[in-house]
């Protein structure tokens, strides 16, 4: 396995797809990295030469990926919570941040249903 940005990328996949296993690298950024380095996107990772792997390592260092990106996102969220803005409070309460409805839906964000006892008549 080739190790790029601290991640073992899968050997059997095409380079274009394998680079997306790195957190912070999607298909668009993967294509950009490959065009900048001149590596063929259709080649498999196992067929890459050592010089190609070195080029890819150098190109990914130009971007914020993996741990640095996770830390940066976490700090941005913590900043919102510290200043007490609406977005920060919504993050803290594990509710949708961007104005979605919560009376129904929002199950992913709110977690599984908690059963509430019905009223006796």
Curated annotation (Swiss-Prot):
Comp. bias (Basic residues): 100-121
Gene Ontology, cellular component aspect: cytosol; small ribosomal subunit
Gene Ontology BP terms: translation
Gene Ontology molecular function, alphabetical: rRNA binding; structural constituent of ribosome; tRNA binding
Keyword terms, alphabetized: Ribonucleoprotein, Ribosomal protein, RNA-binding, rRNA-binding, tRNA-binding
Residue ranges of the region described as Disordered: 89-121
Subunit-structure text: Part of the 30S ribosomal subunit. Forms a loose heterodimer with protein S19. Forms two bridges to the 50S subunit in the 70S ribosome.
Record HAMAP family: Ribosomal_uS13
PANTHER family assigned to the protein according to its UniProt record, in alphabetical order: 30S RIBOSOMAL PROTEIN S13/40S RIBOSOMAL PROTEIN S18, SMALL RIBOSOMAL SUBUNIT PROTEIN US13M
Matching NCBIfam families: uS13_bact
Similarity comment: Belongs to the universal ribosomal protein uS13 family.
Biological role: Located at the top of the head of the 30S subunit, it contacts several helices of the 16S rRNA. In the 70S ribosome it contacts the 23S rRNA (bridge B1a) and protein L5 of the 50S subunit (bridge B1b), connecting the 2 subunits; these bridges are implicated in subunit movement. Contacts the tRNAs in the A and P-sites.
Name recorded for this polypeptide: Small ribosomal subunit protein uS13
Organism: Prochlorococcus marinus subsp. pastoris (strain CCMP1986 / NIES-2087 / MED4)
